[in-house]
Amino acid sequence: MTIIELLKALLLGFIEGMTEFAPVSSTGHMIIVDDMWLQTTDFLGKYSANTFKIVIQLGSILAVIVVFWKRLFSLIGLYKIEGEHDASGTHKLKLRHVLIGLLPAAVLGLLFEDFIDENLFSIDTVIIGLAAGAILMIAADKLGPKEPKTTSLDQISYRQAALVGLFQCISLWPGFSRSGSTISGGVFLGMNHRTAADFTFIMAVPIMFGASALSLVKNWEYINVGDLGFYVVGFIASFGFALLSIRFFLKLINKIKLVPFAIYRLVLAAVLAVIVYM
């Protein structure tokens, strides 16, 4: 394992950590950077490179667990959050809300996993996803309720959870972004941006962990002991930068909303289109 290869692992971990939960599409960025520049398959091999991407995604998931551990543990009865729920308990966020929200994308992902992997992971589809996702985000900011009524996780209804879950299905198209799709959906449904983001991140833990764990089991045989340093550097970088990204994003999202991210996506899509098609 050379210094250059370790620096590539650090860079990919940085990209994964900074983009996984921002509404800019981490998958899109990984495809762009890796396929057009770093090309980890050249020195890791196709299957080992895929395993590496799974490992660094687990780093990002761990960062979400660290940030939301109280809420996540409360959902499974291992921690009690005092004084943060409605007195009636009618709208207290439950594990059922999360399961309802993640079910549509989980089912579609399992049904169409092979089709998506074989047909949608390309620069062309990423460009489309970046642009279309940007339009959705701008529409959410401009057309969503001006005074959202759902301003905390404990006010989310089952109906809202289910509909946000349908919005999450859009993110199966590379470049759309899971957080971009679900936060936009939440805003359309009357959530403020922070509440939609909180629900997005909490909902991401089981679906991302499950998908990553399943993929890791499938690709376990392709892990090369000689590449462990590459995996470790990528995992640590992804975890650290995701932790910073999540905290920063949650502090700002109610103020800046989605339009700045949408503009970035449109610019990136345009630049990629020029590079690829001109």
Swiss-Prot record:
GO molecular function annotation: undecaprenyl-diphosphatase activity
GO term, biological process aspect, one: regulation of cell shape
Enzyme Commission numbers on file: 3.6.1.27
Main location: membrane
Keywords: Antibiotic resistance, Cell membrane, Cell shape, Cell wall biogenesis/degradation, Hydrolase, Membrane, Peptidoglycan synthesis, Transmembrane, Transmembrane helix
GO cellular component, one term: plasma membrane
InterPro entries: UppP
Transmembrane segments: 49-69, 97-117, 120-140, 197-217, 226-246, 258-278
Location(s), subcellular: Cell membrane
Any Pfam family matching the protein: BacA
Enzyme class, spelled out: hydrolase
Catalytic activity: di-trans,octa-cis-undecaprenyl diphosphate + H2O = di-trans,octa-cis-undecaprenyl phosphate + phosphate + H(+)
Topology class, membrane: Multi-pass membrane protein
Note: Bacitracin is thought to be involved in the inhibition of peptidoglycan synthesis by sequestering undecaprenyl diphosphate, thereby reducing the pool of lipid carrier available.
Role: Catalyzes the dephosphorylation of undecaprenyl diphosphate (UPP). Confers resistance to bacitracin.
Family membership noted in the UniProt record: Belongs to the UppP family.
Name this protein carries in UniProt: Undecaprenyl-diphosphatase
Naturally occurring in which organism (per UniProt): Exiguobacterium sibiricum (strain DSM 17290 / CCUG 55495 / CIP 109462 / JCM 13490 / 255-15)
